[in-house]
């Protein structure tokens, strides 16, 4: 029950709050591997919730695992173009089974992370960029923690036409003797005023770890001007990557 509160509280705020009054709602960071280039204005709040997502994978030794998780991201503006982010994975359930081994189950919470997002100068209506620096401030349960990690990421978005856009995301993460670099290209289509579609690929190269490659697609639907629903999937492109990742979520903006 203690991990359910961070998810239930934002949902209660959504149901109790009127629509945002801002002329333009900034873009949300979910779904997808990367993040958006918009920043939340000072005094406003964006809440982005991952409803239980699913991941299935098998390693080279034949051990299979399935994971259910729910994540939470809070974004609030500190100054024009600068926002504070707080994120965590308060709910995790994992089941593992290896060859000739009994099935094991684990539950708990992941790490909590603080980040600063800066929407860089020089952005235009056609091309925009942003940086995100983040670090773990509270470790989760041992089975789900990556230890003290710090990351610097960048995202660039370019509008090709009124409906099509492309983006490139890159990040470098290190800590606790680990080091990894991820990059992800994507292309998005505004199918209508309320529905968006995207395709993405992601590639991670880690120190002393196998390289990972995935590709997938997603859908966003603006339920209200300040409320977004999403669904997405990624599949592994090699034997070391997760076989399948499924995610759904909701995001809302309060001004």
Positions of the model-derived regions?
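Transmembrane beta-barrel domains of Gram-negative outer membranes and organellar outer membranes
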Residues: 22-255
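N-terminal signal peptide c-region/cleavage motif recognized by signal peptidases
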Residues: 16-19
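Bacterial N-terminal signal peptides that target proteins for export
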Residues: 1-8
């Amino acid at each position: 029950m203690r991990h359910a509160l961070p998810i239930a509280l934002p949902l209660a705020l959504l149901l109790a709050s009127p629509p945002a009054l801002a002329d333009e709602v900034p873009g949300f960071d979910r779904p997808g591997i990367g993040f958006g280039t918009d920043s939340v204005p000072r005094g406003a709040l964006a809440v982005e919730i991952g409803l239980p997502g699913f991941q299935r994978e098998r390693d080279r030794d034949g051990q299979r695992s399935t994971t259910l998780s729910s994540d939470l991201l809070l974004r609030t503006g500190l100054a024009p173009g600068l926002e504070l982010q707080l994120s965590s994975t308060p709910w995790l359930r994992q089941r593992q089974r290896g060859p000739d081994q009994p099935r094991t189950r684990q539950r708990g919470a992941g790490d909590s992370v603080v980040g600063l997002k800066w929407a860089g100068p020089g952005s235009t209506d056609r091309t925009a960029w942003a940086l995100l620096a983040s670090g773990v401030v509270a470790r989760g349960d041992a089975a789900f923690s990556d230890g003290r990690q710090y990351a610097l990421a960048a995202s660039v978005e370019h509008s090709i036409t009124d409906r099509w856009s492309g983006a490139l995301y890159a990040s470098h993460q290190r800590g606790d003797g680990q080091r990894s670099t991820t990059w992800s290209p994507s292309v998005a289509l505004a199918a209508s005023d309320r529905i968006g579609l995207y395709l993405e690929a992601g590639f991670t190269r880690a120190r002393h770890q196998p390289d990972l490659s995935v590709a997938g697609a997603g859908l966003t639907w603006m339920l209200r001007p300040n409320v977004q629903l999403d669904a997405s999937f990624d599949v592994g492109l090699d034997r070391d990557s997760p076989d399948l990742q499924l995610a759904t979520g909701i995001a809302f903006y309060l001004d």
